[in-house]
Swiss-Prot record:
Catalyzes the reversible transfer of the terminal phosphate group between ATP and AMP. Plays an important role in cellular energy homeostasis and in adenine nucleotide metabolism. The gene is adk. This is Adenylate kinase. It comes from the Bacteria. Pathway: Purine metabolism; AMP biosynthesis via salvage pathway; AMP from ADP: step 1/1. Keywords: ATP-binding, Cytoplasm, Kinase, Nucleotide biosynthesis, Nucleotide-binding, Transferase. One of its GO terms (biological process) is AMP salvage. It is an enzyme of class 2 (transferase). Its main location: cytoplasm. It comes from Jannaschia sp. (strain CCS1). The lineage of its organism: Bacteria, Pseudomonadati, Pseudomonadota, Alphaproteobacteria, Rhodobacterales.
Length: 191
């Protein structure tokens, strides 16, 4: 089973992906994690990624699709796409890739959380990390969140209509206890 978790920054996508990995043995494909791992891998793709990043350039969709292809071909018991796709062009590229490797996209789960709650979550996440002596993400502040939300609404939210038209979109309330959100996602996956 392959799924995409969609939602604005701070919606809890990473938290819920972690639960799915633990409970269902799925593989989380986080583009950020894949790029960092590729950079240090010493592979041909890794050297390409390192060169692009070292020059301060944006990693192209083609490179990201190549990394995802490697993961899909390595196999697994279902994939969670986290941080990809972010645009309609990327959604089309992912659909083409899945078709090429003989896989399907089973569900796109959109996590609903209002902006006010997102601000509270992000501020709280930063406070909890600082209190625990852990590093605070540089973008875990209200000003950065506003910029990230603008980007999300501009570029990523059109994916909601795209996947709705394909009858793959499922809404799950993202507010509430982590376990309640996880149950909502499980209900979608088990339906």
């Amino acid at each position: 089973m392959n799924i995409i978790l969609l939602g604005p920054p701070g919606a809890g996508k990473g938290t819920q992906a972690g639960i799915l990995v633990k409970d269902r043995g799925m593989v989380q494909l986080s583009t950020g994690d894949m790029l960092r791992a590729a950079r240090t891998s010493g592979t041909e793709m890794g050297n390409l990624v390192a060169g692009v990043m070292d020059r301060g350039e944006l990693v192209t969709d083609e490179i990201v699709i190549g990394l995802i292809r490697e993961q899909l071909e390595a196999g697994g018991s279902g994939f969670i796409f986290d941080g990809f796709p972010r645009t309609l062009a990327q959604a089309d590229a992912l659909a083409d890739l899945l078709a090429e490797v003989g896989q399907t996209l089973d569900h796109v789960i959109a996590m609903e959380v209002n902006d006010e709650a997102l601000v509270g979550r992000i501020v709280n996440r930063a406070k909890e990390a600082a209190a625990a002596g852990q590093p605070v993400r540089a973008d875990d502040n209200e000003e950065s969140l506003k910029i990230r939300l603008m980007e999300y609404y501009k570029k990523t939210s059109p994916l909601l209509g795209y996947y709705h038209a394909k009858e793959q979109l499922r809404w799950v309330p993202g507010l509430g206890a982590i376990d309640d959100v996880a149950k909502g996602i499980a209900d979608v996956l088990d339906a």
